[in-house]
Amino acid sequence: PAHPKRIAVPAMVLPNMVYALQGNAENMVSIPPAAYSGWEMSILKDLAPELEDVDTTMVNDDFSVNVEALADADVDLVLNWDSETDQAEQLKALGIPCVLVSSAKDMDGLKSLVTMLGDALNCEDRAKQVTDWYDETMDYFNSKADEVAALSEDEMPRVLHFQNVH
């Protein structure tokens, strides 16, 4: 649909990307339980409080969906991984469009994914803004490569990175 009003997003990382492109999550009606857990433990809880009551029973952590439940919920778009072709056919048979996307394996793949989601969500301008920002940022850092390479060991900045993965 040109302007999806009720989206189900079984693919784990895509709810965050949908939010980033739309600027809200008001039209997301179902996300996987693991994505909901991620929402609870992140800044998205403050940015997208509308996800507090989102359904987590129609889509599963293994990307599978309850086709009948999605139809009953009047879902008008499903965003999922390209490995879910059988489910996509079932959804299409019920009149529910399904956009299947590839998991990004590199930054070019991620930019393609953002562009494809922008097209599906009617957020093409925002998707272009995101990919342009990435290109500009990479150009900036690449322009500093020679400068950084010329630094001595003592001049190199030190960074400590903490990461908590559940």
PLM regions and their residue ranges:
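Conserved H-X4-D acyltransferase segment
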Residues: P1-G23, V165
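Extracytoplasmic
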Residues: A2-K5, G23, D62-V65, D86, ...
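A structural signal for short loop-to-beta-strand junctions that line the ligand-binding cleft
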Residues: H3, A48-D61, V99-S112, M116
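Structural recognition of the beta-strand scaffold that forms the well-ordered cores
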Residues: A8-A11, V29-P32, L77-W81, C98-S102, ...
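Solvent-exposed loop/turn segments at secondary-structure junctions
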Residues: V13-N16, A34-S37, L77-V78, S83-Q87, ...
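A short, structured surface patch at a secondary-structure boundary
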Residues: P15-A69, A73, L77-L79
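Extracytoplasmic substrate-binding proteins
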Residues: Q87-H166
